[in-house]
């Protein structure tokens, strides 16, 4: 659990302090499940309703919401009262999940930053009309040993900075600039990556054909020039 951090927000008269309280979401959910179990034992509430609510609280989706919310709360830059920060965090969390509609839910992955790098490659970007994706997990690298990332994960943010709609170089710079560790928000969309790679392969094939045609034309021109020189001599 992160320790509370204190940031100052100067005003015209005096500096006011905003204390960012640490979240206790894991403990809160565990306590809620404990209370549900006690209610179930008492028989005051229909068992099937309590079991349904308990199942929701223990689901992967609820865990993902909790992780993303806590990540947003820790990284979002907001000055103001705790209520204002909570509203801003909630909006950022909803936006992350709304962007994932039709795909896997967002996940938070934290990797240590070492001299050997992070152990994955990215492709795509605004200049290619494509999201930024994890295109390769390097065998034996940090990402593979950690096990949190997958080939086909779309990169949503790096250390709290969104890379959706950004150029490829922006994501690379953020990854390189990270110190000690890097927190990523990703979502798994392998089909989109496959479509993107297929599109890139078509472009590469078309480029190779153009180069071959250009080479043939150059050879033909050289042959014509050589033929003309032979006739002149």
UniProtKB/Swiss-Prot annotation:
Expressed in brain, testis, kidney, placenta and liver. GO terms for biological process: exocytosis; inner ear development; neurotransmitter secretion; protein transport; protein-containing complex assembly; regulation of synaptic assembly at neuromuscular junction; synaptic vesicle transport. GO terms for molecular function: L27 domain binding; protein-macromolecule adaptor activity. It is found in: Cell membrane; Basolateral cell membrane; Cell junction; Postsynaptic density membrane. GO terms for cellular component: basolateral plasma membrane; bicellular tight junction; cell-cell junction; extracellular exosome; MPP7-DLG1-LIN7 complex; plasma membrane; postsynaptic density membrane; presynapse. It comes from Homo sapiens. Plays a role in establishing and maintaining the asymmetric distribution of channels and receptors at the plasma membrane of polarized cells. Forms membrane-associated multiprotein complexes that may regulate delivery and recycling of proteins to the correct membrane domains. The tripartite complex composed of LIN7 (LIN7A, LIN7B or LIN7C), CASK and APBA1 associates with the motor protein KIF17 to transport vesicles containing N-methyl-D-aspartate (NMDA) receptor subunit NR2B along microtubules. Its main location: membrane. Residues 108-190 form the PDZ domain. Gene3D superfamilies: 2.30.42.10, L27 domain. This is Protein lin-7 homolog A. The kinase interacting site is required for proper delivery of ERBB2 to the basolateral membrane. The gene is LIN7A. It is a peripheral membrane protein.
